[in-house]
Regions:
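Signature of N-terminal electron-transfer/Fe-S-associated modules in redox systems
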Residues: 1-151
Length: 151
């Protein structure tokens, strides 16, 4: 049985090691902030951090995740005080909100790796995260705001 550390807690997952991490996070561990969007890694709704890197949990198997540190939107900040979350609020990014967890996780990984991202780096990093409401301009502004606050 795969053992995976999610948000600082060790979990023994009684499931097929080929199960997508997304379903273990949502259905077994009970953390529903990570969303299912497409199931093929194209939309970004299921983005989590694995050892600090943004990954698509719908494509990452339990076997792939074993031995790695997984952080979901719930683990990014217990009280919503991560700079990206605060910037999201300050820039009025959310509309329907479905993509927000994945967008925030992708943006947080970007800022951790590239504390002062250029406009093109933001566009490139966020290109795999789809927002059906079209708030891309506000998303980019929020990332710039968060980067300023962090740096």
């Amino acid at each position: 049985m795969p053992q995976i550390k999610i948000n600082g807690v060790e979990h023994t997952i009684d499931a097929d090691p080929q199960m997508p991490l997304l379903w273990a996070i949502r259905d077994i561990v009970g953390l529903t902030g990570t969303k299912f969007g497409c199931g093929v890694g194209a939309c970004g709704a299921c983005t989590v951090h694995m050892d600090g890197q943004a990954v698509r949990s719908c494509l990452t198997t339990l076997a792939d995740a074993q031995g790695h540190v997984i952080v979901t939107i719930e683990g990014l900040s217990a009280d919503g005080s991560h700079p990206v979350q605060l910037a999201w609020q300050a820039n009025n990014v959310p509309q329907c909100g479905y993509c927000q967890a994945g967008q925030i996780m992708q943006a947080a990984a970007l800022i951790k790796q590239t504390p002062k991202p250029s406009d093109q780096q933001i566009v490139d990093a966020m290109s795999g995260n789809i927002c059906r409401c079209g708030t891309y301009q506000r998303i980019r502004q929020a990332i710039k705001s968060a980067a300023e606050w962090v740096g």
